[in-house]
Amino acid sequence: MTRSLKKNPFVAKHLLRKIEKLNTKAEKEIIITWSRASTIIPTMIGHTIAIHNGREHLPVYIIDLMVGHKLGEFSPTINFRGHAKNDTRSRR
């Protein structure tokens, strides 16, 4: 189910505070966050946010097409290594 339109989009308060502080300074620096569930809002456009994927923080530059999506969508948590090699010797 999608979130009700009566409610506002979820953004972690600590992340929102950091973005508003950088917007008043007009400085660009990487914001580190573990909040993958936060929704991208228009005030985040132009910032680089390092999103935690379970092992490291992946920097993501926010553009206008990302508004409305969650931060976790842009930092993959699983690295697909490929399917197992088809080994015919082990079957015999």
From Swiss-Prot:
GO CC term (a single one): mitochondrial small ribosomal subunit
GO terms of molecular function: rRNA binding; structural constituent of ribosome
Record-annotated membrane-spanning stretches: none
Gene3D superfamilies given in the database record: 30s Ribosomal Protein S19, Chain A
Subcellular location(s) per record: Plastid, Chloroplast
InterPro entries per the UniProt record, alphabetical: Ribosomal_uS19, Ribosomal_uS19_bac-type, Ribosomal_uS19_CS, Ribosomal_uS19_SF
UniProt cross-references to SUPFAM superfamilies, sorted A to Z: Ribosomal protein S19 (SSF54570)
Entry keyword RNA-binding: yes
Pfam families per record: Ribosomal_S19
Keywords noted in UniProt: Chloroplast, Plastid, Ribonucleoprotein, Ribosomal protein, RNA-binding, rRNA-binding
Gene Ontology biological process: ribosomal small subunit assembly; translation
Database matches in HAMAP family: Ribosomal_uS19 (MF_00531)
NCBIfam families, per database record: rpsS_bact
Family: Belongs to the universal ribosomal protein uS19 family.
Alphabetical list of PANTHER family matching this protein: RIBOSOMAL PROTEIN S19P FAMILY MEMBER, SMALL RIBOSOMAL SUBUNIT PROTEIN US19M
Name of protein: Small ribosomal subunit protein uS19c
Origin species: Draba nemorosa (Woodland whitlowgrass)
Name of the gene this protein is made from: rps19
